[in-house]
Swiss-Prot record:
Domain of life: Bacteria
Gene: serS
Record has Amino-acid biosynthesis as a keyword: no
Principal location listed in the UniProt entry: cytoplasm
NCBIfam families xref list: serS (TIGR00414)
Protein name per its UniProtKB record: Serine--tRNA ligase
Species assigned in the record: Gloeobacter violaceus (strain ATCC 29082 / PCC 7421)
Length: 429
């Protein structure tokens, strides 16, 4: 959620920055400015009426103490004015409450403001390539898609998952389940070695948690909801881990906080009809290891760089070719002020595909979740900055290993980093 001060100080500049995301936010911002102005005017009028009422009470008391009769015309006039002011106060209070509620409902619909260094662009075609790592493998045969490799080797079965649930689910079997479990353990071990504290959070969260991290109200259609209990299946571990500190004031000594968490993730993929209908790239249920950070505002750019490096480390250890891109304003996520995507090479598609998205939200989520800290050198409290990123999406890493490590005979070599977990060199039928 944006700082209301941005609306008051320079609404024209705010409109200009948000409009670089695509669309036109002019009308919404003008509505918010008007509501905020009306609410503050109502508050001022309330304060004045309240002060006048208090003064009238004192005047009546003074007259009565001096022996003025209760029925004196001046006393009666003052009392009537007091009665009128009470009615006015009630009216102004209701008016202010309504304006505040309308403002509070509209403000969360605005996305975060892109940082100044974010490249301006319309869509993914305008994203900026930052760097490449590794060399895509060259095969002397036509590389198979990961879903074909996986089913031939008995690692995965989509038909049985569809029988149990519906399309866009998978059942991992035998060495497929082993490889998935190995990847999860490997990723968590790497991040723990880098100082992250592991969390195993709830997989169901309440509406306040979904709102706190920005999934609601915008992404309600893409989420699975248990309506009878007002709970939501988590779309990412970012939601429960960030909300562990909701409505809390942290001490400066507690920061920075670095967490890693493995969870299943659940997404309806409402807007993805016809895209990635086969394989592990886009499922309703998938596994992910998430990295979540909380820090002081001045430290978030550096923490962002470290976050990206920690996600890259997993790909480098697995020796998977990838590239890093910076998202332009038009491709930036709703709550992100800046974002870097890691894209892994998939030989069957002859292109890089997203495997991690590392975002700096600055104070956007913290304002929604009321997550603050007390700095010893400043009065009052400040909102922390939050950051998160995949470290990594497990299913997509699984797919990348199958495709990049495949052999002509249909077997798949196990990356050196995973051999202590899988305890074999090759995956075969």
């Amino acid at each position: 959620m944006l700082d209301p001060k941005l609306l008051r100080d320079d609404p024209a500049k705010l409109i200009e920055r948000l409009n670089t995301r695509g669309g036109d936010f002019t009308e919404v911002i003008e509505q918010l400015v008007a509501l905020d102005s009306q609410r503050r005017a109502s508050q001022t009028a309330f304060n004045r009426a309240q002060a006048e009422g208090n003064q009238i009470g004192k005047q009546v008391g003074e007259r009565l103490r001096r022996g003025t009769a209760v029925g004196d015309p001046e006393v009666l006039a003052l009392k009537q004015r007091g009665i009128d002011l009470k009615a006015t106060l009630a009216l102004l209070q209701d008016q202010e409450r309504e304006l505040a509620e309308r403002f509070a409902a509209l403000l969360p619909t605005l996305p975060n403001v892109p940082r100044p260094e974010v490249p301006i662009g319309k869509d993914e075609n305008d994203n900026r390539e930052m760097r490449f790592w590794g060399t895509p493998p060259i095969f002397d045969f036509e590389p198979a898609a990961h879903w074909d490799l996986g089913e031939r080797l008995g690692l995965m079965n989509f038909a049985r998952a569809t029988l149990v649930a519906q399309a866009r689910f998978v059942t991992l079997m035998g060495d497929g389940a082993l490889l998935e479990r190995a990847l999860i353990a490997f990723m968590l071990d790497r991040h723990r070695a880098h100082g992250y504290i592991e969390i195993l959070p709830p997989y169901l969260v309440n509406t306040a948690s979904m709102t706190g991290t920005g999934q609601l109200p915008k992404f309600a259609e893409d989420s699975f909801r248990c309506r009878d209990d007002d709970l939501w299946l988590i779309p990412t571990a970012e939601v429960p881990v960030t909300n562990l500190y909701r409505d809390e004031i942290l001490t400066d000594m507690q920061l920075p906080i670095h967490h890693c968490a493995f969870t299943p993730c659940f997404r309806r993929e409402a807007g993805s009809y016809g895209r990635d209908t086969r394989g592990l790239i886009r499922l309703h249920q998938f596994h992910k290891v998430e990295l979540v950070k909380f820090c002081r505002p001045e430290h978030s750019p550096t923490e962002h760089e470290k976050l990206v490096a920690d996600a890259e480390d997993v790909l480098q250890q697995l020796e998977l070719p990838y590239r890093v891109i910076e998202l332009c304003t038009g491709d930036l996520g709703f709550g992100a002020a800046r974002c870097f995507d890691l894209e892994v090479w998939l030989p069957s598609q002859n292109r890089y595909r997203e495997i991690s998205s590392c975002s700096n939200f600055e104070d956007f989520q913290a304002r929604r979740a009321n997550l603050r800290f007390k700095a010893p050198d400043k009065k009052g409290t400040e909102f922390v900055h939050t950051l998160n990123g995949s470290g990594l999406a497990v299913g997509r890493t699984f797919a990348a290993i199958l495709e990049n490590y495949q052999n002509r005979d249909g077997t798949v070599r196990v990356p050196e980093a995973l051999k202590p977990y899988v305890r074999r060199d090759v995956l075969s039928r």
